[in-house]
Amino acid sequence: MLLPNILLTGTPGVGKTTLGKELASKSGLKYINVGDLAREEQLYDGYDEEYDCPILDEDRVVDELDNQMREGGVIVDYHGCDFFPERWFHIVFVLRTDTNVLYERLETRGYNEKKLTDNIQCEIFQVLYEEATASYKEEIVHQLPSNKPEELENNVDQILKWIEQWIKDHNS
C-alpha cells in the first residue's frame, strides 16, 4: 500500500514534535525527528560557537533517510527544509506560533538571548514559510496555527483526514 510522506517544519518551539508524535500514534505512519536522528547517528559537520550547537551535515541526513522516504509513510520533523529532495514529500505543513507564545516556549528551553532573538525574528519574517514555498510546489505547502491545545487537536484531525484521503486516492 502506498503511504504519503509529510514534512512538519517551522521555527523551533512551534510544536512540530508534539504534532508529529501525535500524528504518528494516530495514523501509524513513522515519525522521524531530524534533530534526534542527527544526534543518534552523529550526522554533524562541525560546531557553531555563536549558537552553541552542532552543525547538521545535510548530505548525510539525506543519505540516511532516502530509503525510508522512498518506501513512504514517513512524518519528518525539522526546522529547515531547503535541503530535502522535493520528491520526498506529498505535503508540507509550516507551523506558526504567535511570537509572545513562542518566546515563552523558547525561554523555557533555556535558549540564550541571541538564539531567542533570532528565532523570534525568524517567525516574524516568516522565514520558514518562505523557505518551504521556495523549496516545494506552492499547492502542497500549508500553514497551521500552533498556539493552543485546541489548535493541536484541530491540526491532528485535519491532517488525519488528509492522510486518509491521500491513501484512498493512491491505492484504488
From Swiss-Prot:
InterPro entries xrefs: Adenyl_kinase_AK6, P-loop_NTPase
Protein's UniProt keywords contain Nucleotide-binding: yes
Region NMP: start-end pairs: 33-56
Region (NMPbind): 33-56
Superkingdom of the organism of origin: Eukaryota
Entry keywords, A to Z: ATP-binding, Cytoplasm, Kinase, Nucleotide-binding, Nucleus, Ribosome biogenesis, rRNA processing, Transferase
GO MF term (any one): adenylate kinase activity
Annotated EC: 2.7.4.3
Catalytic activity: AMP + ATP = 2 ADP; ATP + H2O = ADP + phosphate + H(+)
Gene3D superfamilies the record matches: P-loop containing nucleotide triphosphate hydrolases
Any one cellular-component term (Gene Ontology): nucleoplasm
GO biological process, one term: rRNA processing
Tissue: Expressed in heart, brain, placenta, lung, liver, skeletal muscle, kidney, pancreas, chorionic villi and the central nervous system.
Subcellular location: Cytoplasm; Nucleus, Nucleoplasm; Nucleus, Cajal body
SUPFAM superfamilies xrefs: P-loop containing nucleoside triphosphate hydrolases (SSF52540)
Annotated positions binding ATP: G13, G15, K16, T17, T18, R109, K148
Principal subcellular localization: cytoplasm
Location of the region described as LID in the Swiss-Prot/TrEMBL record: 108-118
Family, per entry: Belongs to the adenylate kinase family. AK6 subfamily.
Role summary: Broad-specificity nucleoside monophosphate (NMP) kinase that catalyzes the reversible transfer of the terminal phosphate group between nucleoside triphosphates and monophosphates. Also has ATPase activity. Involved in the late cytoplasmic maturation steps of the 40S ribosomal particles, specifically 18S rRNA maturation. While NMP activity is not required for ribosome maturation, ATPase activity is. Associates transiently with small ribosomal subunit protein uS11. ATP hydrolysis breaks the interaction with uS11.
PANTHER family cross-referenced by the UniProt entry: ADENYLATE KINASE ISOENZYME 6, POS9-ACTIVATING FACTOR FAP7-RELATED
Quaternary data: Monomer and homodimer. Interacts with small ribosomal subunit protein uS11. Not a structural component of 43S pre-ribosomes, but transiently interacts with them by binding to uS11. Interacts with COIL (via C-terminus).
Name this polypeptide is given: Adenylate kinase isoenzyme 6
Organism: Homo sapiens
